[in-house]
Amino acid sequence: MGHNGGVANHAGVAGAAAAAGLKSAAGLGVVGVSLSGLYAITGIGIPCPWRLLTGTLCPFCGATNMGAALLRGDLDAAWAANPFVLTALSGLTLACIFWVVELLGGTAVRLPRRLSDQRIWYIALAAAGIAFALWRNLLPAA
């Protein structure tokens, strides 16, 4: 096909990427809400293998408490439980909003080309997680 076929095909690929992102986020959301709800009801959480082995908190320790606090609508308690995961969740929520707008026919929001490589985001997220783990384990509680 001509130019229009390429544009339509590109739009279909972009829409497929948005749908795939939403599908992944929905799966993560179902698991997170389920585990947080179970913890809120029963008090039974997930033991952290890292904490069991080292006695230190991993970047995700407190995420179940954070989720339970969000289910109660207590943003302060959610932040106190795990600000790293809460911040990452906020970013994921923003991405989901953009994907829904795109799937409903709105403008697709894209990062600048220099920031579009997923490896950059994986490295940045890992570095932030390590920095957060060091901060929460090495600095005295205020």
What is the meaning of each model-derived region?
Residues 2-52:
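N-terminal pre-ligand scaffold of iron-sulfur
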Residues 109-128:
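Interfacial loop-to-transmembrane junctions
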Residues 45-81:
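Iron-sulfur (Fe-S) cluster-binding segments and ferredoxin-like electron-carrier domains
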